[in-house]
Amino acid sequence: MNALLSNPFKRGLLRGETQIGLWLSSTSSYMAEIAATSGYDWLLIDGEHAPNTIQDLYHQLQAIAPYASQPVIRPVEGNRSLIKQVLDIGARTLLVPMVDTAEQAREVVSATRYPPIGSRGVGAGVARAARWGRVENYMAEANDELCLLIQVESRTALENLDAILEVDGIDGVFIGPADLSASLGYPDDAGHPDVQRVIEQSIRRIRAAGKAAGFLAVDPAMAEKCLAWGANFVAVGVDTMLYTQALDRRLAMFKSDSAQPQEKTSY
C-alpha cells in the first residue's frame, strides 16, 4: 500500500473506533490548517452549504495534509462529474448529501470507483491524487482506499434506509439532523422528542447493519447522546459557529448594550 493513498479514517471506521470531527465552513485554507493543529480525528470541508470552489477545496486539502487530522469532503451533490473532480484533487473520503434511495446510493458508489467496478473517469496523469501519474498502481489502490459516506436526511431516505444499507461500497451513513427534522415537520428543531427518537433508531439500525454511523451535533449534550447510541464518527462543532460565538462572548464582556451570545443547539 502506497502511504499517500492510505486512509486512516477508513481504517478507524473498520476497527469500530470512535472518531471526533469538526465542520469547516469558512472556505479558508488558513482556518483549515489552524483546525488541523487542534487534533480532531477528521475535518469536514463543506462544499454543500459553504461557498467553496474546487480550488478552495484543493487548497484546504493541501493545508490539512501535513497533520494527523483526516479530511472529509462534502460535495454540493452526488453529481458524477463533481465527484470525479473532488477525488482527482486528492479527497479519499467523501460525504455525499441527499441520498434518498438505494439506486442513488449505487450511482454514487459507481461514480467513486474506477472501472471495471465503477465508472469514475480516468485522468491520473493530471491528478494531485495520483501525484500527477507518479503513484504506481494508483487506480486499484484508490478503489480500495476510498471511503464513502452518504447522508440520510429525509423521510423518504428513512423509508429506504434498509435498502440503502444493503448497497455494497458504502462505509458509513450520516444522519443529517437539520434537513431530517425539517422533512419530519419540525424545521430547525432537531431536539424535538419525535426527531430525537428517529435519530436514535436510525443510528442503531445503521450500526446493526455493520456500517459506521455519523452525526453533526453542535450541542455537546446531543453529541454525547449520539455517541451513547452508537454513532462512531461525530462532528462536535462548526468553525464559523464557534467563531461567531467566541466573538459575541468577548464583545459582551466589554459592551453592556451588545446582544447576549446565543448558544445554538442546531446547525
Curated annotation (Swiss-Prot):
The active site is at H49 (proton acceptor). It catalyses: 2-dehydro-3-deoxy-L-rhamnonate = (S)-lactaldehyde + pyruvate. The record marks R74 as: Transition state stabilizer. It comes from the Bacteria. Its cofactor is Mg(2+). GO terms for molecular function: 2-keto-3-deoxy-L-rhamnonate aldolase activity; magnesium ion binding. Keywords: Lyase, Magnesium, Metal-binding. One of its GO terms (cellular component) is cytoplasm. Mg(2+) binds at E153, D179. Catalyzes the reversible retro-aldol cleavage of 2-keto-3-deoxy-L-rhamnonate (KDR) to pyruvate and lactaldehyde. Belongs to the HpcH/HpaI aldolase family. KDR aldolase subfamily. NCBIfam families: PRK10128.1 (NF007521). Homohexamer. This is 2-keto-3-deoxy-L-rhamnonate aldolase. The gene is rhmA.
